[in-house]
Amino acid sequence: MIRKAIARVVERQDLSEAEMIEVMDQVMSGGATPAQIASFITALRMKGETVDEITGAARVMRDRALPIRVGKSVLGIDRDDINLDRETILDTCGTGGSGTNSFNISTTVAFIVSACGVKVAKHGNRAVSSSCGSADVLEALGVNLDVTPDVVERSIAQIGIGFLFAPALHGAMKHAIGPRREIGIRTIFNILGPLTNPAGADCQVLGVYREDLVEKLAQVLKKLGCRSGFVVHGCDGMDEITLTGESTVAEITADGVKLYKVTPEQFGLERAPLAELHGGDALGNAVIVRDILSGKDGAKRRIVLLNAGYALVATGKAKDVAEGIRLAAETIDSGAAMKQLERLVALTNEAE
């Protein structure tokens, strides 16, 4: 199938969702050669990935992931397996790759939102092109990444937050590692991670590195069963809602997807230059995260509050972003968000 798919994609013909599922099954089962994988994902990138193609690839990756069971259900290809009355599960995983050298905003947000009573299954990885991925900063904060799936499940159930370390849960991705590394360009695999949460997160705030991906990935999430959420991109390239200017937002609701622009001023927040939002290496970013969770003021706190506000709206904990920002600020200042970090560190290290 992959040889036929390469020939079609080279001619700029789109694949159906079913065809993409067949191709990705071949890739992730080890049935495609490295040359075929590299050719296919390069041709797909040059053509431009469609909503159906991304959806099909995400379904296969979800189906082959090691599941993290939260409650009684896990998100997979078959939507009938899902208990729609279960507790909301949030993921704040983004694509990364923004090149803006920002600190770990979505990881900081995860602790705040979980302290507000939302179950958070934070999916993430080590840095690929940046200085510090979510796994890197969590490790620097003292979180033990080398834990079994049952420890992650217990973490989410008992304290309301767990970290889903992508390499440990997506073993089938090993077949694409070599081709991806050797061609050295962004491909469909750079956007699949946030679409394939092994705990079946049904609520997401997903930051993307390109504006043209905002509405597209929102449509994909909708097809995959996301009940509510936001896909976002800052005008400065940040894969977050930024403080430097406008951000593009695609809102996912029961009625569909709505695209619009927002600015910090809409929520009473002062703009900040990108330099004030910069991070560093894992140890430096760990200091930033602790400072924010300890109540330190400044631009870094404001951008975390803004993004947390959207996450709290997505999960139904706030009726609008302004209320979400207020709730996030109160949660930090009460010490509850820092307590979540301390509890995650303790639980994951007790498991050793």
Swiss-Prot record:
BP terms from Gene Ontology: L-tryptophan biosynthetic process
Binding site for Mg(2+) 2: 239-240
Annotated 5-phospho-alpha-D-ribose 1-diphosphate binding sites: 94, 97-98, 102, 104-107, 122-130, 134
GO molecular function: anthranilate phosphoribosyltransferase activity; magnesium ion binding
Involved pathway(s): Amino-acid biosynthesis; L-tryptophan biosynthesis; L-tryptophan from chorismate: step 2/5
Residue numbers binding Mg(2+) 1: 106, 240
Cofactor notes: Binds 2 magnesium ions per monomer.
Cofactor section: Mg(2+)
Residues binding anthranilate 1: 94, 125
GO cellular component: cytosol
Complex and partners: Homodimer.
Protein name as catalogued: Anthranilate phosphoribosyltransferase
Source organism of the structure: Citrifermentans bemidjiense (strain ATCC BAA-1014 / DSM 16622 / JCM 12645 / Bem)
